[in-house]
Amino acid sequence: MRFNIDLLSNDSLTKENFNKIFFKTHSAQNKQYFTDEIYNSFKRVLTPTFHMQNDGNFIEYNKKQKEIISKPIKEMRVKGVFGSGKTTTLVARAVKTYQKLKMDKLHPKILILTYNLTLRNFIRDKLIQVHRDFEIVDFTIINYHQFIKAELNNMEIEMEIPHKNKGMEIEEYYDKYYSNEQLFAKNKDKIIPYDAIYIDEIQDYKRSWMNIIKDSFLAPEGEYIIFGDEKQNIYGNPIKNKDIITNILGRPTELKICHRSDSKIRDLTLEFQKTLFSKKYELDNMVNEKIGEGLFEKEGYTKYTYFLNMPIIPTIYDIIRENILHKIHNVSPNDITILGYTLPLLRELDCYYRILSRENTKTMFETTEIMYLSALSDNEKWLDALRNELARNNYPNNTKLSDEQNIKIKKFIAQLLSIAELYAKYPEKIEKCFSEKCENFKIGFDFFLSFLKTNAKEIQGFRSKVNKANYEIIRRNKKIHFWMNCGMLKISTIHSFKGWESQAVFLIIEDKTTKNEFDELLYTGFTRARENLVIINFGNEEYHKILKPMFDKVNKQ
């Protein structure tokens, strides 16, 4: 044989076997194909660009923001009302500190931490808007769990993943690796510290996480500054004296100016605080940004709707489309977001919305089509029959399909099964779109309905398997690659959208909620809206009694 081939299967792909083959090849020899010259070429091309001052935007900071950005202090906690520009201030402070450190150090190490995976891109966007010179490569922007995982890998500490060690519960796994202060203290000599560390959304952090970051990853004389809003404490972290507990002593520096001071959203949020948070948190004492505030009509559109005993998905869709087309018709789809808190409802709504509106959406979770597509490698008779029918109709002259054509057929099947699932629930609403989809994919509508009926039992079993599968990797990947300016309407859980903002938000409340931290979750959903907020409540009488008077009061002002 001319080639030396090593084959690893699912059973034989272990760390030991991989390393054995890796070092058996040229990788372990001095004369490597991957030379220093090639390495340096890759490094040169992939190195992030230097950020010039002119690349950023000129941002006019208010007096308090300027104070926080320039204050000569090594440790600070910043507390800000919603819409006060906490993240904008954070990145400006980070760049200001970087420039000071740059005088004595060629490449200062700056760490910006989040909790929410999707916020990395948001913070990076904010960073490149700063009107200063800096090298982006010197800034690490990452969420806590990915950061700890990477650092443990650097320390050569192997993590025992729960599904590999069935005796270890998930909670024990997180405590052992992500909350274990002693683990990092023992291995501190293996850690390369950061010159400055900034944490956004600090209310999401456990106290042990704060201690690990500050005690083990901060350089001596390093800067440690944290930002947050305790009223968005959606994970139920401990509260003392109406405030979250952190590892910085003393009262926080406060950002009190809400940049939405003339909006109904601000008034609605303050009413929410008075009604639900007065005994738990300090209420926001906002400072008016604009002179004459209150003399003119409030900006924005707020609406509350309550429904009982109606089909949820079609009703939500009708309300959203009615508001988009007639109330906020001047808002781009790019600036509209639908928020909820249960994935099954949001997935079905996403599929229904795309099919009926014929518009694309952006989600932070798996779509119904992706779920079906990921399971289409199964060899089942009914699936083979459907594949063959679509292949014959779409490629009549091909005896064998190319890889690209096979993938296309799979996508057809995934879309057909998705729309068929909706058709079973809402036949009158979906029939026209379903028929058009069948025509586009060159399969008879009546034929496909007959096919679904004949194979109903097998398809139901297939759907059950699809719904039970784990899609965590897909969700993580979609969150990592989420960008706000994608040109499409977004659909997300409140948790995943935390930290982001949207011009118009449709917030869905279902009939059943978990009371623990739901007030904070709802408040977080409220504050994602910059100007327009529509609440759609399906049968949750407890929150109906709270929210309706609130909206009535604000809308009468």
Regions found by a protein language model. Give the residues of each.
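Conserved helicase motor core of SF1/SF2 NTP-dependent helicases
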Residues: 58, 63, 76-109, 114-130, ...
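N-terminal pre-P-loop "Q-motif" helix
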Residues: 33-44, 49-74, 81, 89
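Short, surface-exposed amphipathic charged segments that create phosphate/polyanion-binding patches used
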Residues: 15-28, 75, 151-164, 267-273, ...
